[in-house]
Amino acid sequence: MRRANLTLLFACLILFALNAEEIDTTKISNTFQLGEIIVLAPRTDNTISQTLNLQMNHINVSEALRSVPSVIFANMGGRFEPTIIVRGFDIRGIPVFVDGIPLQMPYDGDIDLGQLITFDYSQVSLTKGIAPMSLGPNTIGGSINLVSFQPTDKVNVQAITGLGSGNTYEYGINAGSRMEKVFVQASYYERHTDYFMLSHSYQPTTYQSDRKRDNSYSDFQKVNLKLGYLAAPDQEFTINYQYQNNAKGNPPYSGIDEKQTTRFWQWPVWERQSLYFISKNRINTNNSIKTSIYTDKFYNVMKSYDDQSYTTQNKKYAFTSIYNDRNLGGNVILSNTSITGNQLNFSVQINRNEHNSHNVGSPQLTNSDFVWNAGLDDRYLINEKWSLTGGLSYARQKSLKEEDQVTDEGITEFPQNSHQAVNAQLSANWIANEQFSMSAYVAQKTRFATLKERYSYKMGQGLPNPELQPEKATHIDISLQYGVSKNLSINSSMYYIRLHDVIQSVDGIEGNLTQIQNAGEARFSGFDVSLYYLILKNLDLTSSYSFIIQKNETNPELRFTDVPKHKVWSNLSYQPTNWAKVSITHEYYSRRYSRSYGIVADEFHLFNLQGSLSWKQFTLYAGIKNLFDTNYAYAEGYPEAGRNYFTKLVFQLN
C-alpha cells in the first residue's frame, strides 16, 4: 500500500507538471541554492557531484568523500559505521548539515555516515579546518553539507534501479516540476543488502567461520519532499521534509585482540524525520536576510543478543536500548554589501536538543542542552589579486535537564552546567594570474563536549564529568593552486594544528575507573598534493597523496586510532566517445592503529573498475569493487568485502 501511494504521488506530480505553463529555466541549477553554505573564504574544490557518485557507486556520504585529499575513510567496526576523518578530526568535530540545517545526534555526536544515502543529494561538500561562523559551534575540524535537488524545468525525472553482490537491490525516483512561482520536488529511495562476501584469502575465526560475513545485512528507505515559492526574483521560501527508516546488523569482531569483547548487536530501527523551512529575502540593494527554522526527530532501537543466533537476550550483556531524541532550532544570516568590495554576514543560531534513553524494563532518563551562537563573517576584496576573510563567533552551551540515576527516592540529577567558547579565523588569498594562486589562514576553533562525554558511566567503567570544558584547536594552513600547463594542474596544502584541553579518557580515577577530562595536548601536522593531468583528449588522470603525523604530547604511549600516515588515491579515466566511459581507481593506505595500545590494521592497496554506457535518457553503470579480491580491513578484526559487483540503470528526463 505504501509503495502504491508513493507511485500515485509521483504520477500526480508529473501530470500536474505537464499542464504547467512554460518558463525560462536556462539559468537555473538543479542544486538547491538555498541549501548551499555561503563560504566566504577561498577554498579548493571539495565538492562531489551526484554524477560522480553514480559513476563510482558511492552509496553513502563517507564513500563520496573518500577521494578528497587529507580525508581518511574509516570504519568504526564496533558499530559497523563507515565514516571519515579529516586532518585527524573525527565526525564529532566535523558537523553534518543538510541544506545548511544541522543534522545532530544529541547524545554522542557520532553521526553514522553510512546511513546517509547520496541518491537524493545533488552534491556533497566538505570544508577542512576553516568553516563559516554562520554554521554555529563545533566546527573544530571543518564541516559537511549535503545539498538536495531542485527542479529546473516543467518536468524533471530521475529514476534508478540496480543490483549488486550479496543479494543487493536498489530503486528510487527523483521527480520535480518548476512553474513561474512554485516548484515541487519529491524523491523515494530504497536499498537492501543481505550480506557481503569476504576475500578468498580470509582465514576463518571463531566468530567468522566462512566467507559470508555474519550479521552484515542493511536496509534503507528514504522520502524527501520539497515545496518552494518564489514571491519575487529576490524572495524565495521553501519547506522541506525528510524521512528515513533504516536497519542494519553489526558484524562481530573476528580478530586477534584478546582485550576485545565480541558483540552481537543489531539495529532493527534507525529512524529520522526532519522538517525545515528556509527563506531568503532581499531587503534593499545592499541587505538581504536568510532564515531557517527546523525540527528533527531521531528514534533508534539497538538490540544486544546472547550469541550469534540473534534470538535470545538472557545474559548480563544482553539488552535492548532505545533512543528518542529531538532537536529544535533556527538560524538567521543578515548579509550586507554597503562597502564596495566587501561582504559582511552577521548570524545567530539557537538550538535545543533533547536525548531520551532507556533500556527495555528500565525508566527513561532525559538529558538536554540549549546552545546559542552569534557570529560574524567578512570578506574584503582589496584588489583584483588580494582578498581577506575574517570570522569571529561566541557560543554558549547551557544544560536544561541533567537526569542521572533512578533511585528509591526518585530520579537524581547532575549539577547544572554551562560552557562558553570563542572562535576566530583569518585568511588571505592571492591570485597571481590565471595559472597560480595561494591562500593562507589561521583559525582558533572549539568543540563542546557531548552529552555522552559529560554524563556517561561507560557501563559501570567510568565516572561522569558534567564540568567538561570545550576542547580547542589552533589551525595554520598554506595552500596553492598551480596550472602548470593547459593539460596539468596541481593543488597542494600544508597544515599545522595544535590541540589544547583535548577531551580524552584518563585512567586510575577512584580505583580502576576512568573519566573523560580536559587532559590532553596534541598536535597534527601534514600536507597533501593533488594533480589533474589530461594525458590525451579522452584520457585523464586524477591523483593525490596525503600525509599526516599525529602526536599525543600528554601521553605519547597512547596512539591516535584509525588514521594512517600515508594515503594515495588515483583515478585513470578513459572516454572514447561521449556515450561510453571507463575508469580504474586505486587507493593505498599505510597501516593504522585500531586501538590506542598498539593493535594495528595492516596496509593495503585497493583497486576498483567502473564504467558507463549512455543512450538517449538512459545510462547503464556497472563495476567491480575490490578488483583483485584483497583481504583488508580499516579496523583490525573487522574484515571488509572481497571482490564484488554492481550494476544500475538510470533514467534522466530534464
Regions found by a protein language model. Give the residues of each.
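Short acidic/polar hinge/loop motifs at secondary-structure boundaries
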Residues: 73, 101-128
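Periplasmic-side early beta-strands and strand-to-turn transitions of outer-membrane beta-barrels
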Residues: 152-154, 162, 178-268
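Outer-membrane beta-barrel signature, preferentially recognizing the C-terminal barrel domain
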Residues: 257, 262-282, 323, 412-431, ...
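Extracytoplasmic beta-strand/coil segments of soluble accessory domains associated
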Residues: 62-105
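N-terminal periplasmic "start-of-domain" segments of outer-membrane beta-barrel proteins
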Residues: 26-64, 83, 91
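N-terminal periplasmic accessory domains that precede
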Residues: 61-64, 82-85, 97, 112-117, ...
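Gram-negative outer-membrane beta-barrel transporters
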Residues: 351, 383-384, 388, 397, ...
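Conserved C-terminal beta-signal and adjacent last beta-strands/turns
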Residues: 228-231, 268, 426, 476, ...
